[in-house]
Amino acid sequence: MGIRGLMSFVEDYSNEFFVDLKLRNTKLIIDGYSLFHRLCFNSDLELRYGGDYDLFADVVQKFFESLFVCHICPYVVLDGGCDISDKKLTTLKDRAKEKIQAARSLSLGGGGNVCPLLIREVFIQVLIRLEVCFVQSFSEADRDIMTLANHWNCPVLSSDSDFCIFDLRSGFCSLNSFQWRNLNTIKDTQDYYIPARSFSLNAFCHYFNNMNKALLPLFAVLCGNDHVNLPIMDTFISKVRLPLSSKGRRYHRVLGLLNWLSHFDDPTEALDNVLKSLPKKSRENVKELLCCSMEEYQQSPVKLQDFFQYGSYVCTDASDLGLPEWVLGALAKGQLPPFISDALVLRRTFLHTQVENMQRPNAHRISQPIRQIIYGLLLNGPSHAEDIAQNTLPSQLLAFNEVERIDTNIKTSTVYAKQLLKDQCDLSKLAELPLARRQMLLLEALKVKQVVLESIPTFLKLPIAVTCYWLQSTEAKAKLHHLQALLLGMLREPLHAIVNSPGTEDPQRGGAKMLYEELCQVKAPMRPGPRVDLDTAHVFCQWQSCLQMGLYLNQLLSTPLPEPNLTWLYNGSLVHRLCQQLPASSSVESLLSLCPEAKQLYEHLFNATKSYAPAELFLPKTKSKSKKKRQKKKVASLGTTADAKHWYDRSNRFGPLMPESLEEHVENSELE
């Protein structure tokens, strides 16, 4: 992200380029992408098991509470889809490769930073709950952030080195030195502030021979940023013989370029000297590319202040594409993800790698049919209305590219959109379809009958529908304990609500509290823990992929089913730990009987999903001639399993959640 080596350089010499700041009583423009990555990777969160989203949400909430205490008014700006010019494609693919290696390292017990799949959606849900103002730019947000900060004359918070290039009136605060966990008070007052450090562009230019600020965009593209990666620039670097700094070789390129550029009065003179060192046949193309890339550091025409004040988002790049107004509005409000705009504009999407089994096909394969329906809805526009009505769209118009993991590398695969029935409404009117019609489209995509969800609470209808889809897929290798662990995890939100509901103490609340605390203890940190069970990890990565695409389709259809609270829905540490314990224990009925409401809800969830599960999910691992032999075998296995002792020390309250009645259901279904 940003200019190679620049952020490390300015922070290594922070005493030269940064000034101390006591941040309070101000607006603050926050680079949302930088923030949620920083909070995810620097808060000691478990990253191996697909996301402890509740703990991440707690960190996000505490961050913004620190701002509120200091009377700092945050405005979060999120990146949107890829730029229509696709000039960052090489950079994006390089990052995707790096994430694959990091995910592989985590899966084998090593280190690495990989954001859990739904971290961005969780971040947005927390912003909404805390009523933090936010906007999603149509593409990369840096210029929009700079323009808004200068309009409001307030600082920017980010970790992107591009903000060292922008001429920001009130400076740029680096997340690395933003001490939001260490609030201080103004002397002799009770007024809080956040100790921070602000990058001084004036000090930076003064350090390099009082160089002209206007030269910095040229420095950025010569040094190598996300937009420019020309091998021919290495020819220029070698020919100009950049001076070797006394600071050493680590920052040779950064220091050499800055010192070299500082001898020129303006960008035109410097650019001419750059081009002179290149072969004549390359000069015009290189000049055009460099000038175009330097434009990325100029003011944005988008006025985010109008969005925050009046709800109006106008982006000429987006408008010129002829996208429906409701789609543009939903993208700006974060009600549609960048995945949708990438598919709409570029006909290409990135499928982000998770900590999964790298020896198996990537976990997103399971949700491809859902994506094909999403692509079909996006194709369903006025320009193709007649062809769609006759089901005569040529195959090239149905083609979308997906950048996905293949083994430990990336590959672009072609996927064809699902041609929808001729009575489907076009994209511009999709949001106007009756609720029942939109709900039917969603459930048909997930291959679930509406009647199955009738007994399910509204906040769990979408996750249960997704779980039914997941169980039906031949890609999934789910076992009974995987399903049980997921459903148990879904009990945490209603349990938490019971425990924290106002009113006098009652036996029900006491039981709910005991069950909730039991689940909390199960998900206690396991570090330094065992290596990831790759088969279990892969199964849950597949489920999360189904959930992600189910969420996106639900959003595209204007949420015919309520969006679930992702904070409480899935906790990777909990479900992985449950999967370790469940096969080694014997019965859950006594545990769930502590809270009759939780037991009843669990039964509803299980009954809804079991009708879509393959019959082998419920078969015992080894056939036995009698129930007595089965019980003996179970006891014997418990005696040799260290983890089982944990459950039995708790009066045998936890187990595989498969009471005898479920075996009877299986037998009945086989008879039918």
From Swiss-Prot:
Null mutant phenotype: Aste1 deficiency leads to increased genomic instability, impaired DNA repair and defective immunoglobulin class switch recombination.
GO BP, sorted A to Z: double-strand break repair via homologous recombination; double-strand break repair via nonhomologous end joining
Enzyme Commission number: 3.1.-.-
Any GO molecular function: single-stranded DNA endodeoxyribonuclease activity
Positions of the UniProt region annotated as Interaction with SHLD2: 349-398
Keywords: Hydrolase
SUPFAM superfamilies: PIN domain-like (SSF88723)
Broad class of enzyme this protein falls into: hydrolase
Subunit structure: Interacts with SHLD1, SHLD2, SHLD3, RIF1 and MAD2L2/REV7.
Function statement: Structure-specific DNA endonuclease that specifically cleaves single-stranded DNA and 3' overhang DNA. Contributes to the control of DNA double-strand break repair choice by antagonizing BRCA1-dependent homologous recombination (HR) and promoting non-homologous end-joining (NHEJ). Recruited to the single-stranded DNA ends by SHLD2 and cleaves the 3' exposed DNA ends, therefore inhibiting DNA end resection (necessary for HR) and promoting DNA end protection (necessary for NHEJ).
Family: Belongs to the asteroid family.
Record protein name field: Single-strand DNA endonuclease ASTE1
Organism listed in the record: Mus musculus
Lineage: Eukaryota, Metazoa, Chordata, Craniata, Vertebrata
